[in-house]
Amino acid sequence: MINGTDFSFSLGYWPPAGGFGLNTNILGTNLINLSVVLGVLIYFGKGVLSNLLDDRKQKILSTIRDSEELYKGATDQLEKARARLREVEMRADEIQVNGYSQIEREKEDLINAAHENLERLEDSKNETVNFEQQRAIDQVRQQISRQALRRALGTLNSRLNNELHLRTIDHNISMLRAMKNTTD
């Protein structure tokens, strides 16, 4: 049986825990590098992104205006079709004696034609909106890609000096020689 003194005595020989703590070396943790990169991204990317979004907004608004005009044209045609339907109905009342079935066929044909026209216009409007949206998305992607390439090229050109350039060429030449020696 183990008593209380044996238990406390055995705890006295355990080494204290070590190795836990915070790294206070700012250069070792890359906080400065990370903050500089984030600052540069925010500073340069903000203007480009807002310009792209403004352009996209204008394109969407113009597409919506075009779609609304198409919709107004469709409603005008629908009103004309309804007016014609009213005329047909009035004529149907006048010649009801001569053939009720003929009148019904004309009425159905007119309604079907109006519905088909409206559906075609609605489909055309939806296709136009989808096409314009996709085109705008593609343009935004292209603009972002071009801008990123320009910035990357500018960064490379600003950081590439003669010494670094010569070291890179020497390194590549030595790699080619090593490859040539291994193939021989």
From Swiss-Prot:
GO MF, one annotated term: proton-transporting ATP synthase activity, rotational mechanism
GO cellular component: chloroplast thylakoid membrane; proton-transporting ATP synthase complex
Matches recorded under Pfam families: ATP-synt_B
Main location per the UniProt record: plastid
InterPro entries: ATP_synth_b/b'su_bac/chlpt
TM annotation in the entry: 31-53
Compartment(s) of residence: Plastid, Chloroplast thylakoid membrane
Superkingdom per UniProt: Eukaryota
Residues forming coiled coils: none
Keyword line: ATP synthesis, CF(0), Chloroplast, Hydrogen ion transport, Ion transport, Membrane, Plastid, Thylakoid, Transmembrane, Transmembrane helix, Transport
UniProt key word Coiled coil: no
Keyword Transmembrane: yes
Topology of this chain in the membrane: Single-pass membrane protein
Family annotation (NCBIfam families): PRK07352.1 (NF005606)
Function of the molecule: F(1)F(0) ATP synthase produces ATP from ADP in the presence of a proton or sodium gradient. F-type ATPases consist of two structural domains, F(1) containing the extramembraneous catalytic core and F(0) containing the membrane proton channel, linked together by a central stalk and a peripheral stalk. During catalysis, ATP synthesis in the catalytic domain of F(1) is coupled via a rotary mechanism of the central stalk subunits to proton translocation. Component of the F(0) channel, it forms part of the peripheral stalk, linking F(1) to F(0).
Family named by the database record: Belongs to the ATPase B chain family.
Further details from the record: In plastids the F-type ATPase is also known as CF(1)CF(0).
The protein's assembly and partners: F-type ATPases have 2 components, F(1) - the catalytic core - and F(0) - the membrane proton channel. F(1) has five subunits: alpha(3), beta(3), gamma(1), delta(1), epsilon(1). F(0) has four main subunits: a(1), b(1), b'(1) and c(10-14). The alpha and beta chains form an alternating ring which encloses part of the gamma chain. F(1) is attached to F(0) by a central stalk formed by the gamma and epsilon chains, while a peripheral stalk is formed by the delta, b and b' chains.
Protein name according to UniProt: ATP synthase subunit b, chloroplastic
Encoding gene (name): atpF
